[in-house]
Structures are given as structure tokens and as C-alpha cells.
Amino acid sequence: MSLEPNGEDTLTKAAVLIEPGKPLVIEEVVVDKPGPHEVRIRTAACGLCHSDLHFIDGAYPHPLPAIPGHEAAGIVEAVGSEVRTVKPGDAVVTCLSAFCGHCEFCVSGRMSLCMGGDTRRPAGSAPRITR
């Protein structure tokens, strides 16, 4: 895949997990334009929590390569066509535990168990980030 953004994509640097138990590698990656319900954020800061460390050390198997870190703060760069709650330039923090808000798990306060179809990427979808 090309590392050239197509005008709507963004080229940025990221700490990439290539192999568990090895140091992260700083690489340039292409971040795809946001889908209809997605927001692209220019990350200003990102924490690594203990679950990230489990991915890095291999305790939680995960498809690789991967970019750890899900506790980020930054500025909205672009929004998808259906996004109505934030706009480019807004300061935001992330919650990457996607949930639908209306299934039995969400309404009972167990959003981490949500299986709402609209929170999952379809099988065979193009990658959102490429190296």
C-alpha cells in the first residue's frame, strides 16, 4: 500500500507494535478519511494503560501490526457526513469503547459488552490505517 495520502487521508507518525515483546517502532502511517459516523483526531497526548501493556507484551493476542493507546486527547481534524456533535477544531478526549447505547448491555450500564452491529467494522473492510 502506498504511504501517499490521497488528499482526504492524513500522513502521521505513530508508535507501531510489530511484534509482542519488542520495542514499538516509530513509523509514518496513512490514516484514512473518516467514515460517515467517524471522527479523525489530531492526537496531542495519549496514555498507555495496563491493557495496552498486555497487548505489547503479548499477553492479549491481537492482530499485528497495531497502534496501542486508546486514552487520547486532541483536536478534531475531520468528521464523517453523519457526525453532528463535534466539528473540526473542537478539543476532544476519546472513548474507544464503542457502544450503541440501546442494546440490553448498554441500557444496563455494561457498555463494554455491547454487540450492537453499528459499532463493528464490516468483515473485509479496507484498513483505516496503513503503513
Predicted regions and their residues:
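Extracellular beta-rich ligand/substrate-recognition surface
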Residues: 16-23
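Active-site/binding-pocket entry motifs
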Residues: 23, 47-49, 98, 120
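Glycine-rich beta-strand-centered segment in the early N-terminal region that forms part
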Residues: 32-46, 56-107, 112
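Cytochrome P450 core scaffold surrounding the K-helix E-X-X-R motif
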Residues: 51-55
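NAD(P)H dinucleotide-binding glycine-rich loop of Rossmann-like/cofactor-binding domains
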Residues: 100-131
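A structure-centric signal for secondary-structure junctions around beta-strands
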Residues: 11-12, 50, 100
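Basic/polar N-terminal segments that are highly enriched at the extreme N-terminus
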Residues: 1-12
